Curated annotation (Swiss-Prot):
Any Gene Ontology CC annotation: cytoplasm
Family recorded in the similarity comment: Belongs to the IES6 family.
Function of the protein: Proposed core component of the chromatin remodeling INO80 complex which is involved in transcriptional regulation, DNA replication and probably DNA repair. Together with REF6/EIN6, involved in the epigenetic chromatin-dependent regulatory mechanism that monitors the expression of the essential multifunctional plant stress regulator EIN2 via H3K27me3 repressive histone demethylation and histone variant H2A.Z eviction, thus modulating responses to ethylene (ET), especially during embryogenesis. The INO80 complex controls ethylene-induced H2A.Z eviction dynamics.
PANTHER family: INO80 COMPLEX SUBUNIT C (PTHR31200:SF1)
Keywords from the UniProt entry: Cytoplasm, DNA damage, DNA recombination, DNA repair, Ethylene signaling pathway, Nucleus, Stress response, Transcription, Transcription regulation
Protein name according to UniProt: Protein EIN6 ENHANCER
Gene behind this protein: EEN
Amino acid sequence: MERELMEADIVVASRLSFKKKQAYEKYPKAQSSSRRWKHLKQILQAENFPDLPPDLPTYVNIESPPSTQPCKRLCDITGYEAPYVDPRTNLRYANAHVFQTVRSLSSDQVHQYLSIRNAAVVLK
């Protein structure tokens, strides 16, 4: 079949005009593949942090002052934001359903929840 095409004097273009250009023809290959984003672990290993003095600020030991905003009040039972506090038990709660649960707790359980939050009252 190839011999017949050669003898027929048919000229076939190397690239047909109706075909779209491929992406690799439009955009040349990137100049350097060595410029890539580095992960934090790679940066930390490259910096040799143990050799640096401890007062020098780095990624690892940046010291910041305490926050000026008050900490969020979270529900002691569910962990959601708690706009309410039970005056009898001093536990924080998020909604009415949790309030019923708070009221049904024994005094030992209430004391355990308060000790988790470091708000337990110690009587001497």
